[in-house]
């Protein structure tokens, strides 16, 4: 039984974590038992430590290239320590963010270039790509308003960026959606969470039917 990597992407406040938790509830019990949920930045002890550095609001002087390299570093560790071993045992891995986040946030948002950022990430992950990516499509302003309502004053370093940055990131996601239409599928994240999750499960069933066998 082969493993599958399904990633969830979208702007800050799109509800990725909540949607993934709801998706788990909607999966058959047998599939729930072979599913591993993880996140980025993070997912392993070392990667979580790097996450703290990346997102700490105190690190305002962080250079854009440093940021991109730290994301690639935590991803390299995450893949080698968590994702590849899980895939090797036939797990279905659901990851809250993966390489597309770097391509959108650092490649486009930080103007470092999609291809340049992809190159350092491919080096770190050995070229591992998701079998399917769910893009939770939401206007960045709506997402940031959600964050402010839920945890005002506790935003991380990237969430604190100006709206112009978040709009560029969103444009980056749209570009990736158009560039990789076979892998990246869009879901309207304005809908209620249960509907967003149900629509995501429909896409998974259609794109990766073998998972449910």
Curated annotation (Swiss-Prot):
Gene Ontology CC annotation, any one: cytosol
UniProt catalytic activity: dTMP + ATP = dTDP + ADP
Disulphide linkage map: none
Domain of life: Bacteria
Protein function: Phosphorylation of dTMP to form dTDP in both de novo and salvage pathways of dTTP synthesis.
CDD domains: TMPK (cd01672)
Protein keywords: ATP-binding, Kinase, Nucleotide biosynthesis, Nucleotide-binding, Transferase
EC number(s) stated in the UniProt entry for this protein: 2.7.4.9
SUPFAM superfamilies the UniProt entry points to: P-loop containing nucleoside triphosphate hydrolases
UniProt key word Zinc: no
A molecular-function term among this protein's GO annotations: dTMP kinase activity
Organism: Lactobacillus johnsonii (strain CNCM I-12250 / La1 / NCC 533)
Gene3D superfamilies: P-loop containing nucleotide triphosphate hydrolases
GO biological process terms on file: dTDP biosynthetic process; dTTP biosynthetic process; dUDP biosynthetic process
Protein name per its UniProtKB record: Thymidylate kinase
InterPro entries cross-referenced by the UniProt entry: P-loop_NTPase, Thymidylate_kin-like_dom, Thymidylate_kin_CS, Thymidylate_kinase
Family: Belongs to the thymidylate kinase family.
NCBIfam families: DTMP_kinase
Annotated ATP binding sites: 10-17
